[in-house]
Curated annotation (Swiss-Prot):
InterPro entries: KIF15/KIN-12 (IPR044986), Kinesin_motor_CS (IPR019821), Kinesin_motor_dom (IPR001752), Kinesin_motor_dom_sf (IPR036961), P-loop_NTPase (IPR027417). This is Kinesin-like protein KIF15. One of its GO terms (cellular component) is spindle pole. It comes from Strongylocentrotus purpuratus (Purple sea urchin). The lineage of its organism: Eukaryota, Metazoa, Echinodermata, Eleutherozoa, Echinozoa. ATP binds at G99, Q100, T101, G102, S103, G104, K105, T106. Residues 436-517, 586-646 form a coiled coil. It comes from the Eukaryota. It holds the Pfam family Kinesin. Its main location: cytoplasm. Residues 415-424 have a biased composition (Low complexity). It is found in: Cytoplasm; Cytoplasm, Cytoskeleton, Spindle.
């Protein structure tokens, strides 16, 4: 894809994807009968349109507004070019025209309809020009990219007629259906698509479909579109680059909408009226969609009714979706179309507020290797951009550079005396490079070995974990089998001990698993590798910037999280209502208690984990401190050994110097061994040329050896160059004698062999010494580490032992106190056991009651469930009705808004018509006043004419009576002539006034007809307004009825909800009561079980610790039994007393009753039996006194019983408190015991580790000895290998030298190619820039040429019109040729001649302008052809400077053309 299109797409994306609106005002035609009404629009370029209305004019602002005289090319330049460039760049695009019928939509989109071939017409529309521009862009891309750019274009053409979709390319097709897919989106099923490769083929497809479109004539438009036409162009481009294919797919929708119509304007009846209804319905749905999208853009929640119409559903992506959309709003400027124009402008203003989300529809395909290479390339480009072009060189590049530098240095000119030094420097550089490569390989090998060792350790730990898991499974299976055996029985002591042992072993296995966890080792390895990667990544600036951005983003998110949490806490605080403690149900309390218990367990686990973590950190800290101390000690030892080595090296060097001086003296002093010692002049290294060659610089011209001075020390790497002649030799004349060659060779060989042996022996000894030193250093380091650990362990052991002793003392004191309290606990146990039995009986009774209550509750719940189901069904029905009512209410509100909008437009139109009516009435009054004035002037002129006639008649009579004199006749003749001229003038003026009067009468008639039409329209509008008001009132009444129905439904719903809430409350109360009883029973059971379990555990724990207090316990038990027996006796006595009291009370009641009966009987005989009555009253008093005494005694016994029960309760509470305290103490003792066991286990583990370390030290010593012996043997083997390696090294160096020379040549060639490539790229950039400028200039010239053609066609039309006017004028002249009045005829001919002359001048000026325009167009054609030739030549060959100058020379001509156009 070209750079221009990418930049254009980027610019479009940056500007935003809002729907853009272009408003075009059509010209007012002369044949309109109401053209005299004037215009209601005023255009202010470039983006404002003003609509004249009362009380204030309405101002609308859009993206672009054009006047009536605009050209088709300017419309396409503003609308079509950017959309088509975006489509070629991969975006979807849509252009559609909107407006009332007859506003010029089809003309804008297609062109003039009267011409059959309107695709090549000068006035062709947006669609044909879009084809031309699209394929010009495609051809441009093909010329630029060649075969790498593939293009496929498919066209389809459909129409929507009466909400049915028809394929215009298939006339026999029936109604098609819209489908929706995840990949394609919305598409038409079964629609024909034809592939096109040029603009002419696309023209053919459009023309073939256009003939099948439904078009009909109305009173407002000769060829009115009766359907919505959608022409779709699917563009698919494929660009191949480095094996990767970038595929871009886009769609271009070109839509010609049918116009909105009014039946009173179009006079449509029958089928046309039905078509107009469907058109208006689809357009109103489109308006509803745009209103919903505008509401969504303003933040409201709205449903967008895309599916209400086929048109809106098909254009869903174009309206608020993935597309760039341009709307051309066509409006009529005349006053008669005021309402439709206002609604169109409002629609366009609403559409301008919609935002689309356009994205590039691009996909990448290719081979996996190519895609990975592309990803690598992009990452490298990102790294280069982040590092600002500075890429670090790798070791291979540095090595290559060093080798190239060395080669360049070796290739330079060197003198004969420095050949030995250059060869030695070359060998040294090669050696250093080899050593650096060896170091790199060693580092990699070390890393791989560490990785392998870590993986082996990981495998071993994983094996240990597997074995420990197997052991754990085995222990758990055994415990499961044991528990299954003793499922229905109590556990024996042996089984319990076995279970505890298994659990302890399982815990040990788990601890071992924790110590040898493979995941920890794996995480360690991964951590190391990730740290290394992290270091590498942190060096990159892109990663640093990404981290900074991530940190800032994390801070922002954290602040946002804190703000949200504060808001939630505030909401909870505000929303939470205080609830009384009495109203909280028991189920919530149980849930809260369980949550508290869970939280306590989690807290205990966290504390335990915290303690374990502290223990682990303490052990790791001890290990690290010991390692640190060992490293410090090892560093000190190393420094000491280093100082010793330096002193030793200095001494060795002094000794070697002494030996060297002695050897020189021994060589030079004796006289007998002169010949043997002369051979010690030179010792050379292996592999170099001998100095005795033909090129040796130490020989003179005559071949005699030159003398050289003796060296004071041996040169490095075993090279000895000594040329020495002592004074004694010179005295004896040995110098004059020549040395035999075989003697020199034998001496040299003997000395080299001896020196090589000494060097080998020295190297072996040095290596052994270094190995022993390293082993000794490691051993010392380990021993120091172990000593430090041992010291730390002993210190820790001493502190722990002291703490343990203190703790043991505390435990003994606590144990003594616990034994004292056990006796009291035993007593409490017996008491609670009795209470437990009582509770069991109570629980059984409570279970029976609960069962009965459960039955009752199940019946009640079933009844409530039935009632609740019925109420739920009623609620659902009411909610459905409410949803339907709310939907109807929304629809009614939408209809109300639409009616209100229509009412507003009608109101504005009515006000505009009233204003126009007032203007016309004023104009009519003015015309009437003018007519009256003209009539008065005519009357005056007629009267004057009559007086003049009378005068002429009198003069003629006087002339007939007598000829007085010739002079009087002449005067009279002159007067007659003057009168005649005045009469002609008056007649001429009368004719003109008559013409004016006729014209004013015609104007008056037109005004009257306009007034009548306005009155009719006013009446019709008033009727429509009244009907609308009636409909609005009806709608309001319906809305009120619906609201009342909704209110009643809501009341019913509230009542049913209240009933449901009451029923639910009653149900909840029943559930709560049942749950309360169940919770009470469960609490009692839990408390009983818990107390029984606690007491059982306490007794089992304290039996073992309190065996010596059994006797005391037995005594207490006896006393307790006695007290219980006394209590039972007291209970029995109480029961007996109560029974006696009840019997006596009954007897007393019987006696009272009998006495009352006797009293009734005795009342009659009262006077007679007074003496007999005293005896029973005394008996009764005695009996009452006795009963009172018994009652008082019973009350005293009851009081004593209550006191005893209170004492019993107090004792029981004290015993419970003592049991709790003893339990806490026992727990503390258990914790102390566990900590003691842990310390003992740690102590044993540390002693075991120390023994293991000692054993390992001994094993390592023995293994080190074996390794030393093995290394000695290896050294002997490696000596032989070294010799072969040296030979291989020489061969490799020679090969390396040859490769280096070839590499230098390749690098030089590469630099030349890179320079050529840079030049080619610069030329390519220049050509692309020139091509883009040429393309812009070509398109500008093309658009200007099209505008000139359009102006030319307009001028030809004006010329033909003027010719027609001229011909009509000639006809009128010929008609006036037979005029009777000669003077009037002469005046008329003179006026016609002047008019003819004026028209001829105008025609000549127009012909001149036409010729000039033709010459300019021909010149522009020539320039255009020249530009095309230059473009083809520039695309075929790289541009030269001459081409650039010619292109620059073309610019003044285009400026000249522009100047002529402006002129």
């Amino acid at each position: 894809m070209s750079k221009k299109l990418k930049e254009q797409a980027a610019n479009d994306a940056s500007e935003g994807d809002a729907i853009k609106v272009f408003v075009r005002v059509r010209p007012s035609e002369s044949h309109d009968a109401d053209a005299a009404f004037g215009q209601c629009l005023e255009v202010r370029l470039p983006d404002t349109i003003i609509m004249h209305s009362k009380p204030e004019p309405k101002v609308f602002t859009y993206d672009h507004v054009t006047a009536a005289n605009t050209t088709q090319e300017s419309v396409f330049t503003a609308v079509g070019k950017r959309i088509i460039e975006s489509c070629v760049g991969g975006f979807n695009g849509t252009i559609f025209a909107y407006g009332q019928t007859g506003s010029g939509k089809t003309f804008t989109m297609l062109g003039p309809c009267e011409d059959g071939d309107n695709f090549h017409h000068e006035m062709r529309g947006v669609i044909p020009r879009s084809f031309e521009y699209l394929f010009s862009l495609v051809n441009r891309e093909r010329e630029k990219h060649g075969d790498r750019y593939e293009f496929l274009c498919r066209c389809s053409f459909l129409e929507i007629y009466n909400e049915q979709i028809y394929d215009l390319l298939d006339p026999a097709s029936l109604g098609l259906h819209l489908r929706e897919n995840m990949k394609k989106g919305v598409f038409v099923d079964g629609l024909i698509e034809r592939a096109v490769a040029s603009a002419s083929e696309a023209y053919g497809v459009l023309q073939a479909g256009w003939h099948n479109r439904r078009v009909a004539a109305t009173s407002m438009n000769r060829e009115s579109s009766r359907s919505h036409a959608v022409f779709t162009v699917s563009i698919e481009s494929k660009e191949k680059k480095a094996g990767v294919s970038n595929i871009r797919v886009s769609q271009l929708h070109l839509v010609d909408l049918a116009g909105s119509e009014r039946q009173k304007d179009t006079k449509a009846i029958g089928v046309r009226l039905k078509e107009a209804g469907s058109i208006n319905k689809s357009l109103s749905i489109l308006g509803n969609v745009i209103m919903a999208l505008v509401d969504i853009a303003h933040g409201k929640q709205r449903h967008v009714p895309y599916r209400d119409s086929k048109l809106s559903f098909l254009l869903r992506d174009s309206l608020g979706g993935n597309a760039k959309t341009y709307i051309i709003a066509n409006v009529h400027p005349d006053a008669k179309c005021f309402g439709e124009t206002l609604s169109t402008l409002k629609f366009a203003r609403r559409a301008k507020m919609i935002k689309n989300r356009a994205v590039v529809n691009e996909d990448t395909q290719g081979n996996v290797m190519h895609l990975q290479a592309e990803i690598r390339r992009l990452r490298e480009a990102l790294c280069m951009k982040g590092a600002e072009g500075s890429i670090p060189r790798g070791p291979s590049e540095s090595g290559d550079s060093q080798m190239s530098n060395s080669s360049t240095e070796s290739n330079g000119p060197v003198s004969g005396q420095q050949s030995g030094s250059s060869s030695s420097s070359k060998w040294k550089k090669y050696f250093l490079e080899a050593m650096s490569l060896r170091d790199i390989v060693e580092v990699e090998k070390r890393e791989m070995r560490e990785k392998v060792s870590s993986l082996e350790e990981l495998c071993s730990k994983r094996d240990q974990v597997i074995s420990s898991n197997k052991m754990i499974i085995k222990f758990r299976n055994s415990t499961i089998d044991m528990l299954q055996k003793t499922k229905n029985k109590a556990l024996l002591k042996e089984d319990r001990d076995l279970l505890n042992e298994n659990l302890k072993k399982e815990i040990e296995q788990l601890q071992e698993q924790l110590e040898h966890n493979p995941f920890v080792m794996r995480y360690v390895v991964e951590n190391q590798s990730l740290r290394a990667q992290n270091k590498k990544l942190k060096m990159m600036e892109a990663v640093r910037s990404g981290e900074a951005m991530a940190a800032t983003k994390a801070e922002e998110l954290e602040t946002l999280f804190l703000e949200l949490r504060e808001g939630l806490s505030k909401n909870r605080r505000y929303s939470s209502t205080p609830v009384d403690g009495e109203k909280v149900p028991t189920s919530t309390l149980v849930i809260l208690k369980s949550q508290i218990k869970k939280l306590q367990d989690e807290l205990e686990n966290a504390k335990q984990e915290h303690a374990e973590q502290e223990e682990m950190t303490r052990t790791t800290r001890l290990d690290l401190e010991s390692e640190l101390a060992a490293y410090k000690k090892a560093n000190l030892d190393m420094e000491k050994t280093l100082q010793g080595m330096k002193i030793k090296n200095r001494m060795d060097r002094d000794a070697m110097n002494d030996i060297h001086m002695q050897t020189i003296k021994s060589i030079t002093t004796p006289k007998k061994v002169t010949y043997q010692l002369r051979s010690r002049t030179v010792l050379r290294t292996a592999g170099e040329e001998t100095p005795g060659g033909p090129g040796f610089a130490g020989l003179s011209d005559n071949g005699s050896p030159l003398r050289s001075h003796s060296t004071n020390s041996l040169p490095p790497s075993g090279d000895i160059l000594v040329t020495n002649s002592s004074p004694a030799m010179s005295e004896e004349g040995i110098i004059d004698e020549e040395m035999p060659e075989h003697v020199i060779e034998q001496c040299n060989e003997a000395l080299t062999i001896e020196l090589q042996k000494l060097q080998d022996k020295n190297a072996n000894l040095q290596q052994q010494l270094e190995e022993h030193e390293s082993q000794k250093h490691k051993m010392l380091q380990n021993s120091s580490k172990l000593d430090h650990q041992l010291q730390q362990i002993t210190e820790l052991y001493s502190t722990e032992s002291q703490a343990w002793q203190e703790h043991e003392k505390d435990l003994t004191t606590r144990l003594a106190e616990a034994t004292i309290q056990i006796s009291t606990l035993q007593r409490d146990y017996e008491m609670t056991r009795g209470e437990a039995e009582d509770f069991k009986v109570m629980l059984q009774a409570a279970d029976k009651e609960i069962g009965q209550e459960k039955k009752q509750k199940s019946k009640v719940t079933q009844d409530w469930d039935r009632v609740r189901a019925a109420l739920d069904a009623q609620v659902v029905r009411l909610e459905n009705e409410m949803c339907g009512q709310s939907r109807e209410l929304e629809n009614l509100t939408e209809d109300r808004e639409q009616l209100q909008d229509a009412y507003n437009t009608l109101q504005a139109e009515h006000e505009f018509q009233q204003q126009r009516e007032a203007d016309l009435e004023n104009r009519l009054k003015g015309k009437k006043a003018e007519i009256t004035q003209l009539q008065e002037e005519i009357q005056k002129h007629l009267e004057k004419l009559d007086s003049e006639r009378d005068k002429s008649m009198r003069l003629t009579a006087e002339l007939r009576q007598g000829d007085n004199t010739k002079k009087d006749l002449l005067d009279a003749q002159e007067l007659i002539d003057q009168f005649r001229e005045e009469r002609d003038d008056l007649l001429h003026r009368l004719d003109t006034e008559a013409l004016k009067l006729s014209s004013s009468k015609e104007d008056l008639e037109t005004v009257n007809s306009a007034l009548t039409a306005i009155k009719k329209t006013d009446v019709e509008q008033k009727e429509a307004l009244s009907s609308l008001m009636a409909a609005l009132q009806g709608q309001k009444g319906m809305v009120k009825d619906k609201e009342e129905q909704l209110a009643s439904m809501q009341m019913q719903l509230e009542d049913t909800r209240g009933q449901v809430s009451l029923l639910e409350a009653a149900l909840e109360e029943g559930k709560a009561s049942g749950a309360g009883l169940q919770s009470q029973i469960a609490a009692l059971e839990d408390r009983m079980h818990a107390q029984a379990g606690e007491y059982q555990e306490q007794i089992e724990q304290m039996r073992a610790d309190a065996m010596d207090a059994n006797q005391h316990q037995k005594e207490l038990l006896k006393e307790l039994e006695k007290q219980s027996e006394e209590l039972t006796q007291l209970h029995k006595q109480m029961k007996e007393k109560e029974e006696e009291y009840e019997t006596k009370e009954s007897e007393h009641k019987d006696t009272i009753e009998s006495l009352e009966e006797q009293l009734e009987e005795v009342k009659t005989n009262l006077s007679t039996v007074v003496v007999e009555l005293d005896e029973p009253e005394s008996k009764k008093r005695k009996m009452a006194d006795a009963q009172a005494m018994e009652i008082e005694s019973l009350r005293d016994s009851e009081k004593r019983f209550k006191e005893l029960s209170s004492v019993y309760d107090n004792m029981r509470d004290q015993m419970n408190e003592e049991i709790r305290s003893l339990k806490m103490k026992a727990d503390e003792l258990e914790d102390v015991r566990i900590s003691k066991e842990i310390l003992q286990a740690q102590h044993t583990a540390l002693t075991y580790e120390i023994e293991q370390v000692r054993n390992e030290m001994a094993e390592k010593e023995s293994s080190l000895k074996d390794e030393v012996n093995h290394l000695k043997r290896d050294m002997e083997r490696q000596k032989t290998v070294l010799a072969s390696m040296l030979r291989d090294k020489d061969e490799a160096v020679e090969k390396l030298y040859t490769v280096q020379t070839t590499l230098d040549q390749v690098k030089a060639n590469e630099e030349i190619l890179q320079e050529n490539m840079d030049q080619v790229m610069e030329e390519l950039d220049r050509t692309s820039a020139l091509e883009s400028t040429h393309f812009k200039e070509k398109e500008d010239i093309k658009s200007k040429l099209e505008e000139e053609r359009e102006e030319k066609s307009k001028l030809t039309k004006d010329l033909t019109r003027l010719k027609e006017v001229y011909e009509e004028a000639e006809k009128k002249i010929t008609e006036l040729g037979g005029h009777q009045n000669p003077k009037q005829k002469i005046h008329h001919l003179q006026a016609v001649k002047s008019e003819n002359y004026f028209l001829k001048e105008e025609v000549e000026s127009l012909e001149k302008q036409l010729g000039k325009a033709q010459s300019d167009s021909e010149q522009m054609k020539r320039d255009y052809e020249a530009l095309q030739k230059r473009l083809t030549s520039s695309s075929a060959e790289p541009p030269e400077e001459a081409g650039a100058t010619t292109c620059i020379r073309c610019l003044p001509h285009s400026k000249r053309i522009m100047q002529t156009q402006t002129a």
